[in-house]
């Protein structure tokens, strides 16, 4: 909600639209973002949770860690053991399945201990956890597999904060797979096909490819419901069925900041994402030999005639030969091989 509506979670009807979007897109979860404790215009948080569950959408809820910036609430719900158990008990009883906890100021030992306390208690109440505005991944998922993802990245929310990401996003996005995302799940919130407070100049093909290139066990889609609803049918179907946990990953080509083609496998299906990080037209060339897909077919979603459109090709018969994909400046593509 935050990416499109700064204070949207104060508005019951706005958040309800995102739950309806999750139903339409067959996404199993929906996040109720910051300031839900001030919700009005048709209902409160209890009403929204009830509505979400009635539509078979599992709700997750945002919290301020209350350790640094005391801005959006709710505040001080999780800091003490007593308050945390009270809140987690309410969440579990209400049917909430996870928490997104935000605004951690530093890596001092007191905050590192706080992360572990949050995870330990969340496990007891069967709550998934997303740490936002947080430290980098540190392997905690090995001990706490309910830690689904962490931000620790200059992600898409910055289109709503400052203009700095607009000019740098393409190169930045092609650097992250070689750096930040190597060490753990990354809650970048990809897939911004329209504009927030500050515009993006990456293409729609680029934005779609981020959902494959960036790994996150919870992949948050940040754009407005009406934007996703207006996407071409085949693109919506792709986003509806996109996995978030993978069986294999292979780098097919790339160089940090310049370009990347990354393949991820779920079962027998390969998903390939390609990104152009430059301001020039570029052809991305790569071999399919590592994927062993000869005789299979491929659907491609790539840059159209301009940065706001897609070109979609279906049922391309494959060999193991080299592939060439043309990208617009700051462009990209997705391929699905079955």
Model feature map: region roles:
Residues 1-60, 331-332:
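Conserved structural scaffold segments of CAZyme catalytic domains across common CAZy folds
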Residues 22, 102, 129, 213, ...:
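Conserved, mostly hydrophobic/aromatic
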Residues 102, 300-320:
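Solvent-exposed beta-strand/loop surfaces of large extracellular or lumenal domains
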Residues 255-292, 333-336:
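Carbohydrate-binding surface patches
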Residues 205-251:
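Catalytic cores of secreted or luminal carbohydrate-active enzymes
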Residues 315-338:
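C-terminal beta-strand-rich structural cap/linker in extracellular carbohydrate-active enzymes
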Residues 289-305:
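Solvent-exposed beta-hairpin/edge-strand motifs
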Residues 33-203:
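Aromatic- and carboxylate-enriched substrate-binding clefts and catalytic-loop regions
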